[in-house]
Swiss-Prot record:
Keywords: Calcium, Hydrolase, Lipid degradation, Lipid metabolism, Secreted. GO terms for cellular component: extracellular region. The lineage of its organism: Eukaryota, Metazoa, Chordata, Craniata, Vertebrata. Expressed by the venom gland. The active site is at H36. It comes from Heloderma horridum horridum (Mexican beaded lizard). This is Phospholipase A2.
Amino acid sequence: GAFIMPGTLWCGAGNAASDYSQLGTEKDTDMCCRDHDHC
């Protein structure tokens, strides 16, 4: 599978979130990555 940074669902290749509102434990980092993924 794709590598996702620990503590995040959106940082890395693809994402591990089941829906857009879901975030990992590193929320600030994850929100930044999520914004990049949904440009």
